[in-house]
Amino acid sequence: MITDRQLSILNAILEDYVDFGQPVGSKTLIERHNLNVSPATIRNEMKQLEDLNYIEKAHSSSGRSPSQLGFRYYVNRLLEQTSHQKTNKLRRLNQLLVENQYDVSSALTYFADELSNISQYTTLVVHPNHKQDIINNVHLIRANPNLVIMVIVFSSGHVEHVHLASDIPFSNDKLNTISNFVTNKLTEFNQNLQDDIVSFVQSEQEEIFINKLINTMNNHISNQSNSIYMGGKVKLIDALNESNVSSIQPILQYIESNRIAELLQDISSPNINVKIGNEIDDSLSDISIVTSQYHFDETLKGQIAVIGPTAMHYQNVIQLLNRIW
């Protein structure tokens, strides 16, 4: 347990370190924060905080910087303070859906970029799990003799577009007939479906095409549920200073791999969650990940992650994610 004065000093050290990227000394603290105590008192309190492992001494400076434990203490207090706050929720994602004709992938791409521009950090947005949604309609549109565009319409109103190669140039009337058949059978995808297909088709080519359509649709929905949209990738590189350039490559490999998707699934929660440094992975001591949920509606939701250095403006990021519905 630390005293109120030690807490004020810890907050001041942490905020200065985040703002300026340099270890903070007692003289600097007094000048910047108008602390009404002597430098000796500040140094003594800093020594106590160092003994508690909340701050650590820089090798080439007399100043102190926050430790991972110090960041964790600060973040826990922030989360506790904001958990009871009522905020006006932003429904920007719903606007983006309308602007992009309910194309979820396009909307999430713009959403990731917008969040990155607002937060000034790299942002990941995970595609919602459509397995929780219901397919209402399937429309087939012939783009050219050998390409069909499959438009999947979900009960939530969201739309997915899938390209489907075709060995034969089906007429628009035939594609409409196939669309109606598949739509009517959506709730019957079971062991009887293949018999229904055989009874419906008029040629082996039709049977092959419909089976391919169904497999492609199922694979697309499954794959999309794991898709991640990244905004502001370069911001993470810029945020990591020269002292930890060597850590950039493993960090980029991590966020571009399935491991980040697994992490986001593991901490899937309606509440804001913060992972700092080694809490993420032993090789990722230089970054933090702040996660939260976003909603399309009451049932369809996904995960957002904001990624930055451990010296992140946590308060700004938490306030931003707190406003997203």
UniProtKB/Swiss-Prot annotation:
Covalent S-S links between cysteines: none
UniProt GO MF annotations: DNA binding
Listed InterPro entries: GAF-like_dom_sf, HrcA, HrcA_C, WH-like_DNA-bd_sf, WH_DNA-bd_sf, WHTH_transcript_rep_HrcA_IDD
UniProt keyword list: Repressor, Stress response, Transcription, Transcription regulation
Gene Ontology terms describing biological process: negative regulation of DNA-templated transcription
Listed Gene3D superfamilies: 3.30.450.40, Heat-inducible transcription repressor hrca homolog, domain 3 (3.30.390.60), Winged helix-like DNA-binding domain superfamily/Winged helix DNA-binding domain (1.10.10.10)
Top-level division of the source organism's lineage: Bacteria
Residues in coiled coil: none
PANTHER family, sorted: HEAT-INDUCIBLE TRANSCRIPTION REPRESSOR HRCA (PTHR34824:SF1)
Family of the protein in this entry: Belongs to the HrcA family.
Protein name, UniProt field: Heat-inducible transcription repressor HrcA
Organism expressing this protein natively: Staphylococcus aureus (strain bovine RF122 / ET3-1)
Gene that this sequence comes from: hrcA
